[in-house]
């Protein structure tokens, strides 16, 4: 039997740096490993001693793609710690904000990073010539998502309108009405992109490994902004109990922590959300899920990309509904007045890559005494490793380059944000 040695350093078409190592001999996998080599980011240390109104601004910089999600998780943690209530209008606007980010991130990942795998090219660049209409459709949807996020959040990345207690400046009702129509008009383009992905979905490997899925879940909505922690294995947990759910631990090959709950690992992200919130998908989103044969509980991690597509359509439709609700009684609300106080708070939102937790402890002056952030990709690393261990033995009869591509595709299916996940370093000095 042939000997296989794969060493992919700095996997491409993902955010950050990760390596794939695989060695096989005599028809047996001797070693397979997902290595995270990114340098730690230390954001929990950055925010210590900082006043409450600065934390969302700082922590949004954890990620340029998920800056809105980090801002919202940060604000929710601060508001929980200080017993700050926000208006129904602000809650609806924040739901719009997270839809904007979902659309931004999902179309970026599907259109630029995953499509080359579906069409057998090394990057999206050759597709500009061979599939011009498809690439232009992706660019059109990406531009709309960016513009929509700017209208709601003040700018496309690192939002300025989202502040503790509400909004710095509420979006213009005329702008909301304008983008309501643009969202409706985008459905045709979204259907075009979905149809192209459906036609090429045969390129996604048919691989399943049973695992636990964790996401926000709610009784009356497809949970992104609010809800309980849901598990396909263990029901629901209060957000405050997130530490006992994620159970972080360290491994030698990773600068990011691993997580586990009821099994050896769990998965977060679009597929986890769909598995737990399927019944609350919008009508067109559910139609596309059915066309792809995607229904709960799906254990194929490659279908995470299909779930992202379904969520993109859901975000369009639900955003239109949210705008309709907002415009029924829209107000130019004043900026909230906040009196700092001591307290602990946890904020959770489900961002494009999965459930995100921020926890802060404040002193009586409103300065941060302690912070903890648990990032979605950090929760997925362990599941990627266990998928590797199950997937690699099924590939041994393939050429080495094809094995390498399949392993790379598996990581890309998770849409990892690797540099976000290497967020914590604890150094204990002994003299």
Q: Where in the sequence are the language-model features?
A:
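A translation/RNA-centric and nucleic-acid-associated enzymatic feature enriched
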Residues: 353, 358-360, 370
